[in-house]
Amino acid sequence: MSDFITIKKRTHYCGQLDSSDSGKEVILMGWVHRRRDHGGVIFVDFRDREGLVQIVFNPEYSPVAHQEAHKIRSEYVLAVRGAVRNRPEGMVNPDMKTGAIEVMVEELEILNESQTPPFSLESESDISENIRLKYRYLDLRRPQIQRNIMLRNRVAAETRQFFQSNGFIEIETPFLTKSTPEGARDYLVPSRINKGTFYALPQSPQIFKQLLMVSGFDRYFQIVKCFRDEDLRADRQPEFTQIDVEMSFITEDDIIEIMEGLMTHLFSRCLNRTFSTPFPRLSYAEAIGRYGKDNPDIRFGLELRDLTDILADSGLTVFREAAAGGGMIKAIRIPEGKRLSRKDLDDLQNFVSIYGARGLAWARVLADGWTSPIFKFLTADEVRQINGRMEAVEGDVLVFVADTPTVVNDSLGNLRIHLAKKLNLIDPEQFAFVWITEFPLMEFSDTEKRYVSTHHPFTSPVPDDVKYLPGEPGKVRARAYDLVLNGSEVGGGSIRIHRKEIQSLIFEALGLENEEVRSKFGFLLDALEFGTPPHGGIAFGLDRLVMMMTGAESIRDVIAFPKTQKATCLMTDAPSRVSIEQLMELSLKIV
């Protein structure tokens, strides 16, 4: 084993070799993925970041290299020099990118040994995630994880290329900034110099990118880290990366057009997938009405239909009372519902109860009526109208929920997804984009007993709705837009407020006192008085976008060094306690 590499500089990566390299002498460097002995000849699957290639140690070709190869084990680090050749007839491996060739090794140098890893790097499953994260530097050697990280790099590079070719300027914004909570908790950083004060790590560059528009930079982008101290899920991290964009002198349509260009560029260059534009658009009200969610998966049908007007005077008490109490009745049509047994229908009832629904009615559509526990409570005309609105045909199953609008949409919106998975209605290879627009600008918080911003307080209201701000802020629609991909929000943004008087109206509607507004946002209000142009922007979650492009199950599989769902790093043992001396320097005390 050598402290220095004596074999000359690497000439190729393993995974980049093919039949066109046959006859060439190559120098490769990487790791032993798998070792096999066959009749005195040693075969090694040799790995680097670009993939695998089979290298061969034959005593007749190079006795010295063959003798040295007896020492090597899995994950040893090697440098080899040898000749590429086409594999013998019948020995081609079609499951391997480089399966048509192999490298006959003439010279071997063992650069380092390795202990036996705590898990198999060949396995794609059945490994405890905690073990993987504790030994993340080993987990990152696994081919699938490396492919994910390589695609992430490609997405970032293509993003920069796209924006720079469209006249955008990449500008960095501060990480140490002022705490202006935007919905989640801030990560706070104590100042040693200014004792008793704190910076906050940014939840987004929102204010700074708006100030860049005030500064005249016109088209800004940045691939930037953001931080939110919130409870984690499979697709959330305390620190995450977003593609951040802001533009001046534009409308919603301008931003949407550019962002559709970005998405089609990324999917074409990184996955060789093409899409037609423009993408479909739904208002928030349409999305909730048809899908029960503001992030609908439009790869399949099973849309919700409102039957409240038909069933408001129904003989079924639960329907009648829901309508009379300001609630609603909605249904989903399940084509070829004969696939659902009575037990399946009972299970669906249990499923919707998770979302607050008190029951789920069902009906099997026959040629001459229904088979249903509720059939006897309905008139023939009601059944006829329901069949017409649901476009029901013989063999379909209809499922109904009657409750408050929130419960109905939540339960049926989630049931729709559940059914699609159960009935295999989703094409996992399909990507379906949809824009959701005109969100409510504000929503009432039962916890805070006031209206709060649905997105953030700098979102511009729809001009026709400004009149509702003083007395009925819940009616105001936002000039906001989300891009949804396969049922997941991958980006969101809005047209911003560029006039101080409108921004002041928003703060008033949010119940914020002048003193609090000046303390948190005084510099922004001041900037709005110095010729702020109309502007707007958007941010895409890079982690989530790459997760969907790779088909990964968790966002942690597309981040090099992610945190756990408890926001810890098992590899470095962060967060950790610090010394009393460090705390004293910061004038802090643990209580």
Curated annotation (Swiss-Prot):
Organism encoding this protein: Syntrophus aciditrophicus (strain SB)
Record gene name: aspS2
PANTHER family: ASPARTATE--TRNA LIGASE, MITOCHONDRIAL (PTHR22594:SF5), ASPARTYL/LYSYL-TRNA SYNTHETASE (PTHR22594)
Transmembrane residue ranges: none
Positions of region (Aspartate): 206-209
Main localization of the protein described in the UniProt heading: cytoplasm
Physiological role: Aspartyl-tRNA synthetase with relaxed tRNA specificity since it is able to aspartylate not only its cognate tRNA(Asp) but also tRNA(Asn). Reaction proceeds in two steps: L-aspartate is first activated by ATP to form Asp-AMP and then transferred to the acceptor end of tRNA(Asp/Asn).
UniProt xrefs under Pfam families: GAD, tRNA-synt_2, tRNA_anti-codon
GO terms classed as biological process: aspartyl-tRNA aminoacylation
Annotated site residue numbers, Important for tRNA non-discrimination: H38, G90
Catalytic activity entry: tRNA(Asx) + L-aspartate + ATP = L-aspartyl-tRNA(Asx) + AMP + diphosphate
Protein location: Cytoplasm
One GO MF term attached to the UniProt entry: aspartate-tRNA(Asn) ligase activity
Name of protein: Aspartate--tRNA(Asp/Asn) ligase 2
